[in-house]
């Protein structure tokens, strides 16, 4: 379980998040809000890409507030940032392998097979340069790379931004599938409220860095 208590975070001397507190259990938790609400700042803070100015973050009863990003990953939390971070000159398989450097060879092979099971389109393009993929395909590779860490929790920061309707629907289907089949908790920030609510167990709405609403999804 992820437990967030009164966190304050931002960039330099500017606080973007103001005393946020919530828990993520074994569920899909959607974080909604307009541009500038603090969604990306929250995701980067939870992944320990941004420092805390106040408050604490605990995962599985361990304080991870002072963790570095690699320690968070080793703890079982995978982060898929909004920015397209695939390496265009590497193949799809090579991009996926980057996400599994902390695992031994046998587990890496097993995770690669599982990723291909979830994303058959990725398997068909495994030897293709990532730079030739569409935006939707690239995002699937980024998601797959997060799965390659064999995580217990995945943080997805606005993963459908800029995707075509076809890939938006497909992506949300994969999120639900992975949660159910892989026993993974998922925290997803989104502007596409309708789709996110369809798959979420709980919903949080951020407004100017504060929690405006927090409730079970309908």
Write out the residue ranges for each language-model feature.
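A short, proline-enriched helix->beta-strand linker immediately N-terminal to the Walker B motif
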Residues: 148-152
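Helix-to-loop junction immediately C-terminal to a conserved catalytic motif
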Residues: 47
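Catalytic Walker B motif of ABC-type/P-loop ATPase nucleotide-binding domains
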Residues: 154-158
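Conserved ABC ATPase signature
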Residues: 129-133, 137
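ABC-type ATPase nucleotide-binding domains, specifically the catalytic core motifs of the NBD
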Residues: 12, 92-110, 118-121, 215
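The feature captures the beta-strand-to-loop junction immediately N-terminal to the Walker
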Residues: 32-34
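Conserved ABC transporter NBD signature motif
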Residues: 55-64, 75, 108-110, 213-215
């Amino acid at each position: 379980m992820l437990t967030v208590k009164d966190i304050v975070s931002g960039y330099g001397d500017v606080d973007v998040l103001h005393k946020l507190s919530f828990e993520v259990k074994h569920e899909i938790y959607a974080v909604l809000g307009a541009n500038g609400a603090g969604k990306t700042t929250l995701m980067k803070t939870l992944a320990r890409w941004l420092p805390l100015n106040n408050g604490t973050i605990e995962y599985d009863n361990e304080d991870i507030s002072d963790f570095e990003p690699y320690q968070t990953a080793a703890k079982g939390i995978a982060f898929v940032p909004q920015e397209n971070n695939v390496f265009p000159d590497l193949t799809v398989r090579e991009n996926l392998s980057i996400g599994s450097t902390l695992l031994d060879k046998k587990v890496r092979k097993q995770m690669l097979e599982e990723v291909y099971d979830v994303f058959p389109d990725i398997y068909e393009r495994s030897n293709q340069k990532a730079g030739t993929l569409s935006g939707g395909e690239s995002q699937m590779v980024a998601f797959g790379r997060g799965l390659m860490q064999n995580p217990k929790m995945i943080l997805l920061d606005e993963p459908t931004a800029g995707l075509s309707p076809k890939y938006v629907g497909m992506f949300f289907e994969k999120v639900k599938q992975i949660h159910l089949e892989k026993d993974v908790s998922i925290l997803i920030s989104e502007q596409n409220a309708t789709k996110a609510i369809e798959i979420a167990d709980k919903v949080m709405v951020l407004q100017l860095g504060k929690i405006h609403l927090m409730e079970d999804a309908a």
